[in-house]
Amino acid sequence: MRRQPGFSYAGLMVAATCLLIAACSPGDDEQLTGEDQPAIPVETVSAEPIRRSVPFITLRNKTGGSSASDYFGGERGEIHTGYCDITWTPIPLLEPIADRMPFYIPSGTMTLESVIEVSDTEFWRKPANKPVVDQPLLYLHGYNIGFEKGCSRAALFQENLRLASRFLLFSWPSDDTVTNYTHDESDIYWSIAYIKHSLERMIEAFGEGRVDIVSHSMGTRGAVMALVRMSDQHSGDAPLLNHLVLVAADIDAGIFRQYLDIIRPLVRRITLYVSDNDNALSLSEEVHGYPRLGMT
C-alpha cells in the first residue's frame, strides 16, 4: 500500500463516498490510498443560496432551544427521525479554484435553517414508495461532530453524490467537543443497537443487497459492531448489504481483523480509505496503545 500524506477529513470523505456509488457492482474487497481521490465537482456559478433537505435519524437529546442549530444536543436521547434543511451559499471567488487544488477548499457556506421531525412510520414509508434508482446510503459521522455540523457535511455529500432522498444521516450523540473523546467512545458503543435497528429498517425499505454504508472515524466502530450483531441472525448466502466504506477508521486494527470473517458474508464489498498523515488517528493510537485501521 502506497502512502499519500496531506489529505483532510473532508477530502477523504468525498473521495470515499464517490467511490462507493461509482463502484457498486460485486467485487473483491479493496484498499484505497489518497491517490484515488477524485476532484470535487463544482456546478454552481451563482451566488444565490441553494436549499437542500437531508433525512436523518438521531439519538440526541432535544434541548428545547428555539433555533435549528441547538435543536438537538450532545447527550443521549430517544430516536428521532426527520429532515434537516441546509442552505448552501456559493462563494463565486473560490469556485474556479476549488476543483483544481490537491486539497479540499469549501466553495460556499452552509447553514442549518430548520429541523423538521416526522413520525417513525411516516419517515420509513416515504423511501419505500419511491422508485429504486440509486443505492441508498447510510452515513455515520465520526468523533467531535455536533448535529449541525453532521447535517452540513451530509448535505455536501448528498449533493456531490446526487442522492437526494436516498442519503440518510445517522447522527449519534457525539459531543462536538475535542476534549470529550472518551465520552464519545461511550456514546458510539451505546448507539450500536440503534444503528443495527436502522440498518434493518433500511433493508426492509429498500431490499437486501442494496444498502451502502459510509462510516467515518469513530463512527466505524458503530458500523462494524452493528454488523457483528446482525451476523447472528443472518442465514443464507446472499449479502444483506451492498458496500461498506470505512474512512479514516478509528478502530483497533487487530480487533477488526477478528471481526472481518464474521461481517464479510453480510456485505458484498468492503473498502478502506487510509492515510499515513492523520493526526487524530495518531493520537488515538497513543491513547489506546495499538494501531488504528485507518492508518497505513
Give short role names for the model-derived ranges.
Residues 2-13:
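Bacterial N-terminal signal peptides that target proteins for export
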Residues 21-23:
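C-terminal motif of bacterial Sec signal peptides marking the signal peptidase cleavage site
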Residues 25, 29-118, 122-132, 151-155, ...:
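Lipolytic serine-hydrolase domain surface
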Residues 134-141:
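Short beta-strand element of the alpha/beta-hydrolase
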Residues 145-150:
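Short substrate-entry loop that stabilizes the transition state in hydrolases
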Residues 215, 219, 223:
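Gly/Ala-rich beta-loop-alpha elbow adjacent to hydrolase catalytic centers
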